[in-house]
Amino acid sequence: MNYFKRKWNETRGDQYDSWGKSAWYFETDNNGEVLRQIEAYDNGKVLKYDNQNIDDEFGGLADQNLDLSEFVEFSIEKEEFENKWK
């Protein structure tokens, strides 16, 4: 498994724009398929997606593989991801 955290320095641009900027956490397999995803917003809102909870009214689990070569610099430890997933 691979774990990443990537900050998004823009707001959503939709009716939830007031949530602020966000940090996105991904758990992927070795092909870049996103297995679990967390979106953590400045206002404290946290969205979590996986195969049991694919989407909701706010968004959903990535439906495209990540290009792992583009995410190398955003690697994090499994523990950091798991602590946020709780």
Give the ranges of each region predicted by the language model.
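Short, compact, well-ordered microdomains
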Residues: 56-86
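Acidic, low-complexity, intrinsically disordered interaction modules
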Residues: 37-67
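Short, extreme N-terminal segment that most often corresponds to the first beta-strand
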Residues: 1-13
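Short, flexible N-terminal segments of the mature chain
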Residues: 13-41
